[in-house]
């Protein structure tokens, strides 16, 4: 099992944003669905150790998640947030920074292609991209780390159909090649079925 969650709870401002949640997330592609406020994005933050649970236990590859040093874990378990946050400079400089931070060999062209982008995209100014281009650049930046697991927080929520299709095509190819495991948060049940080997529904 990739991740195991046992009675996990997290409180914010005096209320439970996740309460007694238990689930197993296997290797492969898992889609998380559920109503707004169910804690889907919160769960991704917990899996990436951007937050730690107030109650319960999370295991990653049968080892307590809390035993992993956060930065070391994030090199292996990469998060693509819903809102793009690229650094100033070119797309290539963003990818190179991510690869170097993770101690990985930099392969700009290969990384861009895996994210569904043409290699010429490398010289684009990262701060002047469309929202769809930013999201694909964020996917490429996460892939530059060569993670074992990719966490995706509604990566197509703010995109038009064409941009959504490009992101989905890139994720479908990664899934087909079984390069890494993915955990995808989505409000779209159809997208969950298209991109998930397993669909995990989180209760309200």
Where are these regions (language model features)?
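Conserved ABC transporter NBD signature motif
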Residues: 56-64, 73
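Hydrophobic anchor residue at the start of the ABC signature
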Residues: 139
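Conserved catalytic motifs of ABC-family nucleotide-binding domains
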Residues: 83-93, 102
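Conserved ABC ATPase "signature" region
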Residues: 105-121
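Helix-to-loop junction immediately C-terminal to a conserved catalytic motif
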Residues: 48
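Catalytic Walker B motif of ABC-type/P-loop ATPase nucleotide-binding domains
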Residues: 150-154
């Amino acid at each position: 099992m990739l991740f195991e969650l046992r009675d996990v709870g997290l409180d914010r401002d005096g209320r439970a944003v996740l309460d007694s949640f238990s689930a197993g997330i296997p290797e492969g592609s898992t889609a998380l669905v559920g109503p707004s406020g169910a804690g889907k994005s919160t769960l991704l933050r917990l899996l990436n150790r951007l937050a730690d649970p107030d109650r319960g236990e999370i295991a990653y590859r049968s080892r307590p998640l809390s035993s992993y040093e956060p930065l070391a874990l994030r090199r292996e378990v990469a998060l693509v947030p819903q809102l793009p946050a690229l650094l100033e400079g070119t797309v290539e400089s963003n990818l190179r920074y991510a690869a170097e931070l993770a101690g990985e060999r930099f392969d700009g062209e290969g990384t861009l292609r895996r994210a569904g982008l043409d290699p010429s995209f490398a010289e684009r100014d990262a701060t002047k991209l469309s929202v769809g281009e930013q999201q694909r650049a964020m996917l490429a930046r996460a892939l530059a780390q060569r993670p074992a697991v990719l966490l995706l927080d509604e990566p197509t929520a703010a995109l038009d159909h064409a941009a959504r299709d490009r992101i989905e095509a890139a994720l479908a190819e990664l899934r087909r090649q079984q390069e890494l495991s993915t955990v995808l948060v989505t409000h779209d049940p159809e997208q969950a079925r298209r991109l998930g080997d397993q669909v995990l529904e989180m209760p309200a």
